[in-house]
Amino acid sequence: MIDVNNFHYMKIGLASPEKIRSWSFGEVKKPETINYRTLKPEKDGLFCERIFGPTKDWECSCGKYKRVRYKGMVCDRCGVEVTKSKVRRERMGHIELAAPVSHIWYFKGIPSRMGLLLDMSPRALEEVIYFASYVVVDPGPTGLEKKTLLSEAEFRDYYDKYPGQFVAKMGAEGIKDLLEEIDLDEELKLLRDELESATGQRLTRAIKRLEVVESFRNSGNKPSWMILDVLPIIPPEIRPMVQLDGGRFATSDLNDLYRRVINRNNRLKRLLDLGAPGIIVQNEKRMLQEAVDALIDNGRRGRPVTGPGNRPLKSLSHMLKGKQGRFRQNLLGKRVDYSGRSVIAVGPSLKMYQCGLPKEMALELFKPFVMKELVQREIATNIKNAKSKIERMDDEVWDVLEEVIREHPVLLNRAPTLHRLGIQAFEPTLVEGRAIRLHPLVTTAYNADFDGDQMAVHVPLSKEAQAEARMLMLAAQNILNPKDGKPVVTPSQDMVLGNYYLTLERKDAVNTGAIFNNTNEVLKAYANGFVHLHTRIGVHASSFNNPTFTEEQNKKILATSVGKIIFNEIIPDSFAYINEPTQENLERKTPNRYFIDPTTLGEGGLKEYFENEELIEPFNKQFLGNIIAEVFNRFSITDTSMMLDRMKDLGFKFSSKAGITVGVADIVVLPDKQQILDEHEKLVDRITKQFNRGLITEEERYNAVVEIWTDAKDQIQGELMQSLDKTNPIFMMSDSGARGNASNFTQLAGMRGLMAAPSGKIIELPITSSFREGLTVLEYFISTHGARKGLADTALKTADSGYLTRRLVDVAQDVIVREEDCGTDRGLLVSDIKEGTEMIEPFIERIEGRYSKETIRHPETDEIIIRPDELITPEIAKKITDAGIEQMYIRSAFTCNARHGVCEKCYGKNLATGEKVEVGEAVGTIAAQSIGEPGTQLTMRTFHTGGVAGSDITQGLPRIQEIFEARNPKGQAVITEIEGVVEDIKLAKDRQQEIVVKGANETRSYLASGTSRIIVEIGQPVQRGEVLTEGSIEPKNYLSVAGLNATESYLLKEVQKVYRMQGVEIDDKHVEVMVRQMLRKVRIIEAGDTKLLPGSLVDIHNFTDANREAFKHRKRPATAKPVLLGITKASLETESFLSAASFQETTRVLTDAAIKGKRDDLLGLKENVIIGKLIPAGTGMRRYSDVKYEKTAKPVAEVESQTEVTE
């Protein structure tokens, strides 16, 4: 076998007949497969042992030679070589065809490669190949043109006139002769001359032909090899025949297809030997051609060949295509051994880095390890004995298992794996039962819940894999979300509620105002029931020993609550005492107003002080998230994970103690709800009257009514939230962020509001009842539309979002951080992203974690805040914005000069770790996952504003697809192609509006539809590429008008707009990586003296290389314009044919690659996965794998101290 790791590249080409014969181990002459009585392969048949090797290891067919000692012998009786049966997976055979046959890929593909080369139409080719017409190969004295088609009758006429003086042939033979006569160099010269003079369609055709001729010339493929004289037969184990229980046989479809070819070929040979009449031979040749077509690509031409039950047979091409094809089923997605799956249950007592494995599963997964250990400890005598002990589950097995799994991490995965946090490593602990136990905090990353979800377990076997799992994938390491750098392990549900309840304060709590010496006293008093969790008390500040308290403060009493004292025990000591949920308190110090000077208290002591003070808000989910982020910023990952565990335990403990329940009585209907409804009802009546009088249109009436009822709902919601008791359980759940929100509550206690019809249009009749009061039949019926649409949408959305992620990953999979600094001289100018007055993404968020491209000085003090190529930390970012600076140049993936992938400086901080990104990080895949994963949270719907035509704005997922596929958007905006002033806006014919822009040299007028809103005024100056009407810009057009940089920024802004409006935060750099991949090609306009072809798409780097070469030799350079490709198109245009073929349109990609003789340098991840190499990212990168080991005494201890996760 070939060693995969010695591969450097992979090349594909056409096979010459000699090459096919050299692969073959013998010719298959008979269509037989196996003998029905002996079940042995037939000699010279499709499974022949003489050709393909023995079916049993080290045993010839007749049984004369058995055992390994005869290795390499060829049996003199049956001619079978004694060797391993595995060779039946690699040895090929062949069929010598009695007549040449065309290869359907090259004749039928679009464009037809054969047609372009011969300059014949695909129709003409088809007529010749399938024996409907003759083609003139050598005209002789007839005056016919070469390649002319002749019908049967015309051929006879000419034949009678010029017997034996000219040559015209039918079938693939004629085409083969023509292909053999082609002189590629001559053809190339002619085509290059034609390029100079041709225009329009002729030019396009010439360019296409030139491309094919160049391909053949450069690749060393001969055109005649597109016609087959010899047909290869793939090894038999790849098209197996297996016996089923009933004694019947199941066989691969390929065997049927091969059988048809062999039968027809043998019949043709016989007919030729007998000298049969031409028409019979012709018919047989045509049938042979069709049989070979069906074998290569069944169904490409005509009706597909069907098997039993009218099912089309799967040909060689189908074996590669689609989700079930060789690429996606076996090469990119393999099933793995040492894996198990089971239902998950919550494991509240686990540490952050642990998971619970069911005993039986663990035993099965770690079987070989346990067996080895049993034998080593001499508990079992040999491996066989150890195996039986394990199968009987003897008692001594369990102790060994405990030992074996200690410090051996396992990987847990939940499908669908939408981002890299869908697979994490844990240290297993054995649990009873058959459910996998999962730590409650990692559920958010997996998007898992415990209603019956299942998860898969995988065991990393090698030492390297274990080390990677422990160092990089341990759940305690994955605290930040790669998409925005925020903690992903925030507490949820019970944990939030428990911590919220713990930090709540109540006015009526027992013994308010009591003063204690230290925290221990407080806890004792709480345990004895003297104070309640919600009691506000005073404690001597000095007893906290908090480093952030000033001397002054230490002399005073800290006013806080019992619960907050308990909560602060889980926070690291160097933090300020957290007494209120504000950033100030969290990042800097406890506000001074909570320190009370005991001498200033009046008669009533602290109690009186508290009675005049407002209650402090309890800590909700968002604030807990901020605490985690702050701890992460200041401490190591280990400390953070310990703090998280303590927060989780606290939350569970106190949500249990709180005993929060929900009853019908907790839903209090608003008393003056009816009054609000009546007021709005009157407003609706007024609108209806106006409509009846003809003062307003139907659309205006509808929009006004919808607005009135929306306002009514908002008013009820506002008043409801005001009137609620702060200790109402439902309010507590929604306020803490544990479950539900204000809108849910309004539906329960206020009114349900307006509903959407199945069309997406809003029904103007509102549901005025709430669930508490109950809905009328009509109201209930109206509300079912929305519910059903919601479910249908979710199902569609999941599939759409998954497909989007797949396309994104495919286009960006080869973007890896490949160098430290690319040395670019360009940068990206960033500022706030705004839509009108609404802030979409603030400037500070855009610069944090990036490298600066310029020196920034404070505008007042002139002090240097940051120099070029320095990282902008959160502190520096705050300094920059505080100085009043609103825009700056930063390093960006858009302007990175790295040839493959990006460089560290242009990418910036790695959001998953908060450190600078390292060479080898697969940032393309991370970017794709970060954009694709929130896709399921985006809405599907296009907002219908009451059926007003033209103003439907696409939003949510469809809009994201529209942007990344670079499609023409719905509701397209008109942009100006010149800089100037808006001279006039007038009505044109067909109810259109005309906008006239006057520039310095020319005046242009633009037409907009009558319904679109114009957003410029007469006399307003406009820049090139500026929007004149409301809507989305068509990006391809914008690229040619406004240029590359403006287009990149526009696409970035549009993507951010969609996600931010849905409340999803994604870092700019991910979008930048994707957009850069869409703009990495240029289209050649003029070739100059370079070898580039005009009209062809080339990689921007290849273009600059060609021009550099031209400048060196003082030749004319090529000119080109940037092209924006949608992600699907960009994936198919990638340099790597393996990656493109495994994505979509497999046959087209391979046909093209074979003719060009493409080589794949295996730079991306996908290509390497396909051939089974380590991926060239992370630890698989060359620079990390070619490491020299030095043995020293020191590192072992260091490594151990790092891997110990403190309890």
Swiss-Prot record:
Chain ranges passing through the membrane: none
Keyword Nucleotidyltransferase: yes
Residues the entry annotates as binding Zn(2+) 2: 822, 896, 903, 906
Pfam families xrefs: RNA_pol_Rpb1_1, RNA_pol_Rpb1_2, RNA_pol_Rpb1_3, RNA_pol_Rpb1_4, RNA_pol_Rpb1_5
Gene Ontology MF terms in the entry: DNA binding; DNA-directed RNA polymerase activity; magnesium ion binding; zinc ion binding
SUPFAM superfamilies reported in the protein's UniProt record: beta and beta-prime subunits of DNA dependent RNA-polymerase
Co-factor binding comment: Binds 1 Mg(2+) ion per subunit.
Keywords linked to the UniProt accession: DNA-directed RNA polymerase, Magnesium, Metal-binding, Nucleotidyltransferase, Transcription, Transferase, Zinc
UniProt catalytic activity: RNA(n) + a ribonucleoside 5'-triphosphate = RNA(n+1) + diphosphate
GO cellular component, one term: DNA-directed RNA polymerase complex
Residues bound to Mg(2+): 449, 451, 453
Origin: domain of life: Bacteria
Function (record text): DNA-dependent RNA polymerase catalyzes the transcription of DNA into RNA using the four ribonucleoside triphosphates as substrates.
Protein name, entry field: DNA-directed RNA polymerase subunit beta'
